[in-house]
Amino acid sequence: MATILLADDDAAIRDLVRRALSSDGHTVHVTQDGVEALESLGANGAVYDILITDVDMPQLDGISLAEKALAMKPALAVVLMSGFTDQLERAARLRVRRLLSISKPFTLDQIKQVVKSVLA
């Protein structure tokens, strides 16, 4: 199972995704924005397999977070969540081997499948 860092400024999304992925046996750490997520990534001993982040967040958006996170931890898999197609198109231009995106709204089964795909 994976250790996942989840960044989303929407508390309801954070809770739903955390519960869904935890029920599959994953360890999920939640943060409320990109700055907090970046701090968690840089913490001593922090080891994450996957970063799942909303694209549209205040202070540090998800694409900028992904770029900074990958500079720190190049092996990190990244899943970007967004309800805006243009944001996901911008994200697709990132040259990252393990980058997936999911459009909001999504079902819990869909987010679980994305995580399975990343881990495959």
Please place each PLM-identified region on the residue numbering.
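Hydrophobic/aromatic residues positioned on beta-strands within the core alpha/beta folds
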Residues: 81-82
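Short hydrophobic/Thr-rich beta-strand motif most characteristic of the beta2 strand and flanking loop
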Residues: 25-32, 39-40
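Acidic catalytic/metal-coordinating carboxylates
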Residues: 32-36, 61-65
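Receiver (REC) domain active-site loop signature in two-component systems and cognate sites
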Residues: 57
